[in-house]
Amino acid sequence: MSHPDLLAPPDTRPIEVGEVWENPVTLESAVTVDLPWLNDEGRAAGIMTAVPGARVVGEHMHPALVERFSVEDGELTVLLDGRKSVLGAGERAEIQPGVWHDWWNEGDKTAIVRVEVTPGERFGHLIETLFGLAREGHVNKRGMPHPLQLALLATEFSDIIVFRKPPPAVQRPLFGILAPLARRRGYRATYPSLSRTTLAPRVPRDTPAG
């Protein structure tokens, strides 16, 4: 697991409704249906397809955002604050800031789930980075980046996500030690060739996407 090419040209295509974002390692796929600059709440939303065996990269919590799952078809197993439940079609879960959670599809049918995140812009930047690293082969079989990459990513997005392992009390000093080494070895928190969310033009509200 090396790092992406730092000399690769940036991807500055506009981010639009209807895009498909895929992670070939965690088997997540989502179609964007709302973008933070298109609504007053700053919400990002997508329709996620989770095939059997799909799962998020690991148990985590969001310090300052709300995440909502609405199952449209199939079933999604959710671990919410240590309690496991299975959401079926028509059922929802709302995850408040600071609540540890995880999800996966342990059934034999593809799950279709609407996912909403508020506020969503920096969350989108994180997801585009993680998915891009996965597509280029820079993650392990669980979808987690190299520890040097993770040190920079977790520090940059500490307001968005905190992974449960290693424990947060260990992460802070550990990542503080690893971050300078990671930069010297060419790692960056994000990469313009993978993450358009900070550079791409915004499609105005009154301009049809696509």
For each predicted feature, which ranges?
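Jelly-roll (double-stranded beta-helix
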Residues: M1-E28, L35-R43, A54-E59, P63-L65, ...
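Short, well-ordered beta-strand segments enriched in hydrophobic/aromatic residues
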Residues: A44-A50
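Structured binding elements
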Residues: F69
